[in-house]
Structures are given as C-alpha cells and as structure tokens.
Amino acid sequence: MSSLNVKIQDVFDEPACERNRSKDSNARSKGCSKPLTPGAAAGGCAFDGAKIVLQPITDVAHLVHAPLACEGNSWDNRGTASSGPTLWRTSFTTDLTEQDIVMGNSERKLFKAIRQIREAYQPPAIFVYATCVTALIGDDIEAICKRAEETCGLPVVPINSPGFVGSKNLGNKLAGEALLDHVIGTVEPDDAGPCDINILGEFNLSGEFWLVKPLLERLGIRVRACIPGDARYLDIASAHRARAAMLVCSTALINLARKMEERWDIPFFEGSFYGITATSEALRQIADLLVKKGTDLEILDRTDALIAEEEAIAWKKLEEYRPRLKGKRVLINTGGVKSWSLVHALMEIGMEIVGTSVKKSTVEDKERIRQVLKDDLQMFESMSPRELYAMLSEHKADIMLSGGRTQFIALKAKMPWVDINQERHRPYAGYDGTVELVRQIDLAIHNPVWSQVREPAPWESRPATQEPLPNTRPDTDATSVGRSIRRHDAGDFVEC
C-alpha cells in the first residue's frame, strides 16, 4: 500500500469524531463522502481542499505541479486577508504540457520551478501540490522536494493530495497531515509564554479574525499560530509550544487538533466567534484551558470584566435593530460551524429560524442546533434549488443567508439575501462582527427595492382594453372616385 493510501486510511479513522466512532471498520474505511449525483456539480476535490487550508499562509510560495487549469481554477478561492506578506497572492504552477508528460519532463520542470522561486522570491518555505495528472503519471514529488530542500537550503513541503483521492473535506485533513509531518515542531521559539494559544480552522475571511485578536491581546493572550488565516510559516513551525488551542472548524482540521494534543499535550475545545454569546463562551473556555495549564487565576477575572464591557457595548448598538428585526424569519443555507453558531446569534436578537442546512455539519454541530431549535424538522441535509425557491416565493422566510451559489434563487424569488460564505467582503466574527451582520440583515430586509420589484409591472396592472382592428378593406368612397375618372379614347394615345 502506498504512503498516500496509508495516510488516507489514517485520516478516515478519526477517534475525535463521534460520527466516525459510531461506524464499523468497513464503513469507516470509506470516509464520509457521499456518492455524487449524476448531472449535479461535483464540488471541490481533495486538491481544492488542501489548497483552501494552506493558501492563507501568507509568506509561503504555493507551487502547483499540474497543467495550468488546476491553479487557474483554484487561485483565490477564499476571501482571506493578510496583514503583511502578499506572496500567497502570487500564482505559481509548473504549467505542464502534453509534451512534458509524454517526454517525461515533468519532474525536471518541477525541480527547476522550485529553484527559480527560491532565487526570485526568497520565501521561508515552498509548498508543492500534487494533482491528478502528476499523481497518475507517477511523479515522486516527495523525493523531488527532499532533493530541492537539500539543494536550495529552505523547506520544500510536499502536499500529496491529488484531486481524485476524495472530497474537499479529505483534502482539508490531508493538508493538516502535511503540516504535522513537515512543518509543526521544526522550529523552537525563543519567546514561548504561559498564555500562548493556537487557533485552528480560522481562515480570517475578510479579515474577521482581526476583530477577535485585539480581545485576546487585551487579556494578555498571544496567538502563537492561527492556522491558516493570516499565518506565517515560522509561526506554524513553532505552534507546538502553545499551551492551549481553539478549534473553529472541526470539519476541516479536527485531526490536526487531536494529534497536536497527543504529541505535545495541547488541550483544545471547539468553539465559535459568531454571535455575542458564542464569542463570550469562547473567551471563557480559552481562559479556563490556560488556567488548567498553569496560568495565573487572575486571567479569569480579566476575562469576565472584558466580556461584561464588550457585551454591554454590543447590546447597546443592537438595540436599534431589535424592534425592526424581531420576528423576522431567516433561512440559513450554509454548513459547518456557521450552521449552529449563526442560529444562536440571530435568535439572540429575536429573529426566527425557519431552517438551517447541516450538510457539512458534524454530529456535535447538529446536537448544538437541536439544543437551540428543539425541532429536527428545521434542519435539512440538502435542499434543491426548486425547494429553496418555493420556500422563498411562498414567503415562508423573510431573508436567506447563504453563499454566492444560491443568491440568484433568492433574487428570482424577490427576497433579500446576505452572503455569509467565504466569498463575502465583510467580517462577521466577534462582538463588532455580530453588530455588522445584524446591520447588513437589516439593510437587506428593509431595502425599499423589494417593495418596488414585488409590485406588478405596469403592463400587468393596466386594465385590458380591446382595440379595434385596422380596416384592410378598400374604401368605398375611393372606389367611387376611381370610377368617376373619365374614360380615355383612342386619341389620347396617338403619338405626337
């Protein structure tokens, strides 16, 4: 069995996942992916999943060993943000052609590309991604990366996650395995402290982690590594010296959190920064874990004081929206951590949840939703575009929160819509982010355009009148006039 197959089977056997533990050995070996529906979009592949997790590491050069389309279709697939380096925004690919593949030139081309990147950009590390084509022709990227690392004198990390091996979620986990095998623990920090933590599965979408990080800094807590949002290579390499960790998206990186706890005794919990209550609870749990690891008890008092102050400010800002949004019905079509954290956040201001998608949610996510909604009928695994349109057009919801792929369903139904997926341009995390989310929902629902587009069109509201058809018969008067013209005699046509 190849090393990739061994790694995949190891990822499929995840003791920290309740759904995985409930399976027998035969079902566990198949993973959590469901068969694709013929004719439907397949969604992201394993390569796409690995790229999503690792691309936000901002100072690393990400080199895709593939034909041009693999990098062209995956570049900038998440709206993450960087507070410093911009190298991650540059696209690198070996751009394999048919001739490279037929003539066996692909491995030589990869080594040359690594050397060129090192000479031109001097990155702290280079990540090399395997893809379907290069995996099928048998390119040994691990051997090439090892040789390039010895030659160039910098870390060259192989990301062995070709698209055909599985789903996007599997690619997420294989990316975490690559960090464990080649990056984390390779650098010893000289400034490790008692209040260092890791944030796992936080992608810093639209810079939203920047709304949370100042809160942690006010408590004296340092983020040793945020993986992957706005991360630096050296921060991740020294992440093994953190004292505690918070897991934001367990669907993607639960294997990374569990193995870091096993190897380096870094306890973790799963939490969310979406919503006022969820943010406060996350801060308290971080403080509790640090105290258990030996931090001064004073941090608990500081945390309670900070939470009381920030909650008072946030609730004061939300008061103007509460009467305008109370009782409004929301349909949430997303997944993962947002499927339960947004439910709680919106119910806090009096909105009613008519349904939330749990397609990408874990067993723990679903249990959290049940505790809040008390009704399994409000959770749906998947809903077809036709069903979404029917639900919105029949006014069973006042607004839909989803990603860009379903926005036109809401617009066709003439209903408000707010983007909450990775393509969005506004941050919604933390106390300030919650206020911003509520503000955007209020703007969408009360936008005057909806009352206008729902009115009948002018030609639909005008009373029908039957206009007379034009007369195509010859005019009687004109005929009589024609008949009154004098007749010509033979003399009229005599040549002059």
Swiss-Prot record:
Q: Where are the transmembrane segments?
A: none
State any GO BP term from the record. nitrogen fixation
NCBIfam families assigned: nifE (TIGR01283)
Family designation: Belongs to the NifD/NifK/NifE/NifN family.
Domain of life of the native organism: Bacteria
Q: Output the InterPro entries linked to this UniProt entry.
A: Nase/OxRdtase_comp1, Nase_comp1_CS, NifE, NifE-like
CDD domains, per this entry?
A: Nitrogenase_NifE_I
Q: In which pathway does it act?
A: Cofactor biosynthesis; Fe-Mo cofactor biosynthesis
Gene3D superfamilies referenced in this protein's UniProt entry, alphabetically:
Nitrogenase MoFe cofactor biosynthesis protein NifE, C-terminal, Nitrogenase molybdenum iron protein domain
Question: What is the scientific name of the source organism?
Answer: Sinorhizobium fredii (strain NBRC 101917 / NGR234)
> Function of this protein?
This protein may play a role in the biosynthesis of the prosthetic group of nitrogenase (FeMo cofactor).
Keywords, in A-Z order: Nitrogen fixation, Plasmid
Its recorded name reads Nitrogenase iron-molybdenum cofactor biosynthesis protein NifE
Provide the residue span(s) of the region labelled Disordered. 455-491
Q: Which Pfam families match?
A: Oxidored_nitro (PF00148)
Statement: the UniProt record of this protein carries the keyword Metal-binding: no
Q: Name one GO molecular function term.
A: nitrogenase activity
